């Protein structure tokens, strides 16, 4: 075991066995923007052995205040986010397998991309993609972590098919375009992005190490500006969920 992880190995919560599990695990990151770049950075530095980054966008100047893997040179090169991120991450740890996928996640490709992964982490900025991820992960039995951040606050919730409520257990309908604030309408605090993504990865590492007993298992809500942290119990109600109870995969089916 390389001494790269020496300080992490000292943690009772991880240790040598936990590190071996991380080194042998595979993660998919959906989106390589504010959340996604922090997620990727933390996964690679933690020693997750294979990281797949899915994003079709190119880097723009207004990304740089929060998307930590990118710089002005990447903009001059005209690189896609997934490719630029992969180049940076390989320089951080050349032993990690980094696979950039320059594409949107769609009903036509998502199952092929995430098949065989141990976890999917949410770095997206829209609920249509999240509903798609939720359906694909429930269908294939892959844990995933929902996360979102806007303005100064964000939330994280770990979803383990067959054990926890899924996303559509508590968000039944796709929110309308004007129902929720977005980073384009109200902005976003870079430090809030870092905090939410770091909590998301921490929960993800627990899953990858088989430490589900340590999962918070609540919807975590953090406001970085106010300095507040809350956790809300999410329970399945009496109404059966169309996805995890009825196994109806409307978003997967409509795009095929």
Identify the role of each PLM range.
Residues 1-256:
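Adenine nucleotide-associated cytosolic modules
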């Amino acid at each position: 075991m390389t001494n790269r992880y020496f300080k992490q190995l000292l943690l009772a919560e991880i240790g040598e066995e936990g590190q071996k599990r991380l080194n042998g695990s595979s993660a998919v990151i959906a989106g390589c923007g504010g959340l996604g770049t922090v997620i990727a950075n933390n996964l690679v530095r933690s020693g997750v052995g294979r990281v797949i980054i899915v994003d079709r966008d190119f880097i723009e100047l207004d990304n740089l205040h929060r998307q930590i893997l990118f710089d002005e040179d990447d903009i001059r090169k005209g690189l896609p986010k997934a490719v630029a991120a992969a180049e940076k991450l390989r320089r951080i740890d050349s032993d990690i397998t980094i696979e950039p996928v320059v594409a949107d996640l769609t009903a036509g490709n998502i199952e092929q991309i995430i098949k065989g992964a141990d976890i999917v982490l949410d770095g997206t900025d829209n609920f249509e993609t999240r509903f798609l991820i939720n359906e694909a992960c429930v269908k294939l039995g892959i844990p995933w972590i929902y996360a979102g951040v806007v303005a100064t606050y964000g939330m994280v919730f770990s979803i383990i098919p067959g054990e926890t409520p899924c996303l559509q257990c508590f968000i039944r309908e796709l929110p309308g375009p004007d129902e929720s604030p977005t980073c384009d309408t109200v902005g976003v605090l870079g430090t809030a992005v870092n905090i939410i993504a770091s909590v998301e990865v921490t929960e993800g590492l627990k899953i990858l190490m088989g430490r589900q007993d340590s999962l918070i298992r609540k919807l975590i809500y953090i406001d970085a500006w106010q300095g507040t942290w809350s956790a809300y119990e999410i329970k399945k109600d009496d109404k059966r969920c169309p996805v995890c109870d009825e196994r109806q995969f409307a978003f997967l089916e409509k795009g095929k």
